[in-house]
Design a protein with these regions (language model features):
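Short alpha-helical segments and helix-capping/turn motifs at coil-helix boundaries
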Residues: 1-4, 66-70, 152-158
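Short amphipathic alpha-helices and their capping/turn segments at secondary-structure boundaries
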Residues: 1-16, 158-161
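Post-HExxH zinc-binding segment in Zn-dependent metallohydrolases
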Residues: 158-174
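Alpha-helix capping and helix-loop boundary segments enriched in small/acidic/polar residues
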Residues: 119-126, 155, 159-163
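Active-site-proximal segment of zinc-dependent metalloprotease catalytic domains
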Residues: 9-15, 20-149, 169
């Protein structure tokens, strides 16, 4: 079983990191066809590391990062999002994750996806960054762009700098 972790259990807003598989029936994904998302296959230690990293990213905000489905289900419909961490990615090629901008408040349980098979596979740092990134989209954030010294747009998606554990990239923009 996935360890039950909560960063701020008293917050009404909730981001649920779902590692144990989920059947998605939302008509907004996969052309309306159901998606049987497999469990992530990540270890308890990897899940805990992902949770800790995502919790740190969202610490300034009044939002509970959780791996506990009961906390997600008890949160108000318009203040929650499920981020499914899954290797079930063949239906959406070329990305490490995907979500709808602003879907956090839609109230219809449209989830976000993080494709752990494409992130390492199952590298906790990469999975956590993607969870925070897709979670950021769901609350309305866009990508951070790059500009030159004259304030001209040079890239619409800032990929960051460096490699390995000391690398840096923005989670989101806006």
């Amino acid at each position: 079983a996935v360890p039950k972790l909560n960063s701020l259990p008293t917050a009404s807003a909730t981001i649920y990191l779902d590692f144990d598989g989920h059947m998605v029936t939302s008509s907004l994904w996969n052309g309306g066809m159901p998606i049987a998302c497999a469990a992530s296959g990540m270890t308890d230690a990897q899940i805990t590391e992902v949770f800790n990293r995502v919790s740190e990213d969202f610490r300034p905000f009044n939002v509970n990062i959780t791996t506990d489905s009961t906390k997600f289900l008890s949160a108000p419909l318009t203040q929650r999002i499920r981020v499914i961490v899954t290797p079930t990615s063949s239906w959406k090629t070329g990305v490490g994750g995907i979500s709808y901008i602003g879907s956090f408040t839609w109230g219809d349980d449209t989830p976000a996806f993080v494709f752990c098979d494409r992130l390492g596979p199952n590298n906790p740092k990469f999975v956590a960054e993607c969870c925070s990134h897709e979670g950021g989209h769901t609350v309305g954030l866009s990508h951070q762009s790059r500009y030159d010294e004259a304030c001209n747009l040079t890239e619409t998606y800032n990929t960051g700098t460096g490699t390995g554990e000391t690398s840096w990239a923005p989670i989101m923009g806006n």
